[in-house]
Regions:
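N-terminal Rossmann-like FAD-binding beta1-loop-alpha1 element of flavoenzymes
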Residues: 3-38
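Short, well-ordered alpha-helices that flank and scaffold nucleotide-derived cofactor binding pockets
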Residues: 22, 26, 123, 188
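N-terminal FAD cofactor-binding segment of flavoenzymes
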Residues: 23, 27, 42-92
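Phosphate-handling catalytic cores of nucleic-acid transaction enzymes
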Residues: 34, 71, 99, 107, ...
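Flexible phosphate/Mg2+-sensing switch loops adjacent to catalytic phosphate-binding sites
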Residues: 36-39, 43-45, 194-200
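Short beta-strand to alpha-helix junction loop
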Residues: 57-58, 104-123, 134, 175, ...
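Helix-loop-beta segment of a Rossmann-like dinucleotide-binding subdomain
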Residues: 95-114, 151-153
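Predominantly flavin-linked oxidoreductase catalytic cores and closely associated redox partners
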Residues: 127-242
Length: 242
């Protein structure tokens, strides 16, 4: 395969980072993922993904995008034990004071733990011949061409601060999440700080993992109970996983 561009850097081996690396792999000769954590070999929680312990799943759009970028990924997850089914016919939904009618919708979804999903995606990304992972490494700052403002590289530093690396990059994708330093880097480089808009939603989560037995969840993949607005502010869900 011929590539139009030379090098790209992706900050963060998150879900968005892995998908970005996969998308870029078809256009760049080399893609480097810079990740602060030491990535686990298998399915395990890690510090950089604190939300991983909560319930996860893929609805229709996510399911289709994942399978488009990683063909047969859903079959691979299903083989790992992740439940796949119809998001209407195989789930129980309680909304506005009543149970929704179960029927085949033709819309597929999957319920899977975040560590399992990330592990499967990392394996697929590592099979790409032109994507490499730089683990236990912090992003320091991008490098810009002073003549025209184009990004030309990125400086990365090992977590123990013993090694600095200058990476060539025609594109830098920041998938580092809420701790992103991009606004600061842009301001320090003379581009101005982007306007930041935040929406406070006041939502909290609590999760418990339980052992599932055959026949639990009323022969469904998941049970979702939503509060009725405006007074019903609590919701609950029980999702099967691998």
């Amino acid at each position: 395969m011929s590539h139009r561009y030379s090098s790209a850097v992706v900050l963060g081996a998150s879900m968005s980072g892995l998908l970005a690396a996969r998308a870029l792999s078809g256009h760049f000769e080399r893609v480097i993922i810079v990740e602060r954590d030491v990535l686990p070999e298998g399915e395990a929680l890690r510090k950089g993904v604190p939300q991983a312990a909560h319930a996860h799943g893929l609805l229709v759009s996510g399911y289709r995008v994942m399978d488009a970028y990683f063909p047969r990924m859903m079959s691979e997850l299903e083989a790992m034990g992740a439940p796949v089914g119809d998001i209407v016919g195989d789930f129980l939904w309680f909304q506005y004071g009543r149970w929704k009618l179960r029927h085949p919708s033709g819309l597929r979804g999957i319920t899977v733990s975040r560590p399992c999903l990330e592990a499967a995606m990392r394996r697929r990304v590592k099979r790409l011949g032109n994507v490499t992972f730089l683990e236990s490494t912090d992003g320091v700052r991008p490098i810009f061409d002073p003549a025209d403002g184009r990004v030309t590289g990125f400086i990365a530093r090992s977590r123990d601060r013993s090694v600095n690396q200058t990476l060539d990059a025609e594109l830098v994708v920041d998938a580092s999440g809420r701790g992103s330093q991009s606004p600061k880097w842009l301001e320090e480089s003379g581009f101005g700080k982007p306007e930041e808009i935040s929406v406070k939603v006041n939502v909290g989560y609590a999760t418990r993992i339980c052992e599932r037995r055959p026949g639990d969840l009323f022969n469904s993949i998941g049970v979702i109970v939503s509060g009725t607005p405006p007074t019903g502010t609590r919701a609950a869900g029980v999702l099967a996983a691998e």
